């Protein structure tokens, strides 16, 4: 199945789940299906998903889904291993689309209502996965064997935080 189909199916499932959350009853959840969905660049390592607003709309003036230009999700999140996390990402971005622009207490309380607890906690491992995928070398501590994936070589300029030993550059892949 193509990424577009996976994304559309996930969005439908997320909207159905959002309709079942009582705290979201008063919000225009049905309008979320009108928001165009897209993908981030494959080489993005820090951004997992984003809610992009219409040009000229200030974050403080956002009222609902009509102010949203599109929601983009990282294409790696649409693979089988990460689809549960992709569903949570869509939920997170749809909350932004409903007018909760910041990550304040209200937003975090609504975000915590997502039923898949494990998916809510997959962000750190997904970020590590993206960084490891993009890494050209690993800065490795010869003493404690801790690895730090990087795109540039360290050239002996960096030390391990715990051991204070100079990190070695280990080339990754072919």
Regions of interest found by a model, annotated:
Residues 1-88, 97-174:
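Active-site-proximal or metal-binding-adjacent scaffold patches in catalytic folds
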Residues 93:
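Walker B catalytic acidic pair
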């Amino acid at each position: 199945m193509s990424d577009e189909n996976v994304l559309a199916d996930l969005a439908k499932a997320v909207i159905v789940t959002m309709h079942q959350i009582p705290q979201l009853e008063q919000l225009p959840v049905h309008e979320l299906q009108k928001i165009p969905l897209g993908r981030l660049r494959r080489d993005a390592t820090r951004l997992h998903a984003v809610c992009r607003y219409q040009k000229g709309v200030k974050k403080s003036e956002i009222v609902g889904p009509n102010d949203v230009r599109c929601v983009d999700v990282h294409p790696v999140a649409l693979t089988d291993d990460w689809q549960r996390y992709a569903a949570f990402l869509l939920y997170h971005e749809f909350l932004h689309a409903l007018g909760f622009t910041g990550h304040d207490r209200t937003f975090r309380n609504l975000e915590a209502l997502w039923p898949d607890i494990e998916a809510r906690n997959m962000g750190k491992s997904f970020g590590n996965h993206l960084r490891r995928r993009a890494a050209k070398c690993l800065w490795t501590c010869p003493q404690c064997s801790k690895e730090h994936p990087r795109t540039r070589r360290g050239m002996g300029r960096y030390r391990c935080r715990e051991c204070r030993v100079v990190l070695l550059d280990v080339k990754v892949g072919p």
